[in-house]
């Protein structure tokens, strides 16, 4: 077992693990030797970190704006390694927000935000400047949403990770063409790396850094 980031371990070659504050599973996941198994086949962030552990400088004490939090599964793993940090988890679905609120009752470093990531100005009173912007949304204008949120909330030199979903943008064009176009549309950032995600068809992760 190898620690690749503070609190994040490679458990065998194809699994990650975190050190949770509680030994009780949150979503039916396995607990092995006190570590919480994180399956990259089920989480795009886990798939990215297994190939490119890009969160150095963010964990363990950074602030994160997470767009597209859904019911909070990946948010909870990120919370495990942000032991001294904070996650602002933005989700538009009231049903998913109920799950996020239950999660936040167990994790003090998660703040659920019911809101539309395409309207970042609506949560200005809640979200502070952040060290990482993480986006996993299904809207068509994914690059625009990421760029607008980064311009408001991401600190200079802050890290941005965008999971681009090709089929949410265009169901007919080739995925590679969609990825190229969305990356070109990102503004105010320098793209550091584009990472293919095994087990996540028609998705790619884009890692970028905000310009000063």
From Swiss-Prot:
Q: What is its EC number?
A: 2.1.1.-
One GO BP: tRNA processing
Show the GO MF annotations.
Answer: histone H2AQ104 methyltransferase activity; RNA binding; rRNA methyltransferase activity
Arranged from A to Z, the UniProt key words for this protein are: Methyltransferase, RNA-binding, rRNA processing, Transferase, tRNA processing
- Matches recorded under InterPro entries: Fibrillarin (IPR000692), SAM-dependent_MTases_sf (IPR029063)
Q: What class of enzyme is it?
A: transferase
Q: Which Pfam family is one of this chain's hits?
A: Fibrillarin
> In which residues is S-adenosyl-L-methionine bound?
73-74, 91-92, 116-117, 136-139
Indicate the family of this protein. Answer: Belongs to the methyltransferase superfamily. Fibrillarin family.
Q: Cite the record's note on assembly.
A: Interacts with nop5. Component of box C/D small ribonucleoprotein (sRNP) particles that contain rpl7ae, FlpA and nop5, plus a guide RNA.
Q: Which PANTHER family match?
A: FIBRILLARIN, RRNA 2-O-METHYLTRANSFERASE FIBRILLARIN
- Function per UniProt: Involved in pre-rRNA and tRNA processing. Utilizes the methyl donor S-adenosyl-L-methionine to catalyze the site-specific 2'-hydroxyl methylation of ribose moieties in rRNA and tRNA. Site specificity is provided by a guide RNA that base pairs with the substrate. Methylation occurs at a characteristic distance from the sequence involved in base pairing with the guide RNA.
What protein name does the entry list? Fibrillarin-like rRNA/tRNA 2'-O-methyltransferase
């Amino acid at each position: 077992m190898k620690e690749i980031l503070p609190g994040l371990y490679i458990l065998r070659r194809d699994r990650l693990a975190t050190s949770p504050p509680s030994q009780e599973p949150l979503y039916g996941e396995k607990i092995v030797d006190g570590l919480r198994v994180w399956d990259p086949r089920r989480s795009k962030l886990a798939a990215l970190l297994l190939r490119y552990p890009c969160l150095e400088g963010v964990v363990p004490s950074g602030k994160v704006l997470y767009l597209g939090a859904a019911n909070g599964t990946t948010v909870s793993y990120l919370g495990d390694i942000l032991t001294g940090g904070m996650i602002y988890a933005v989700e538009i679905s009231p049903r998913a927000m109920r799950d996020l609120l239950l999660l936040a009752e167990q994790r003090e470093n998660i703040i659920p935000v019911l809101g539309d990531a395409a309207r970042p100005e609506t949560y200005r009173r809640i979200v502070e400047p952040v060290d990482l912007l993480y986006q996993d949304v299904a809207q068509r204008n994914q690059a625009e949403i990421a760029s607008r949120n980064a311009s408001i909330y991401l600190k200079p030199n802050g890290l941005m990770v965008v999971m681009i979903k090709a089929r949410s943008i265009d169901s007919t064009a080739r995925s590679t063409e969609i990825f190229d176009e969305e990356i070109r549309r990102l503004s105010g950032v320098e793209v550091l790396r584009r990472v293919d995600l095994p087990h996540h068809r028609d998705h790619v992760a884009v890692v970028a850094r905000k310009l000063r």
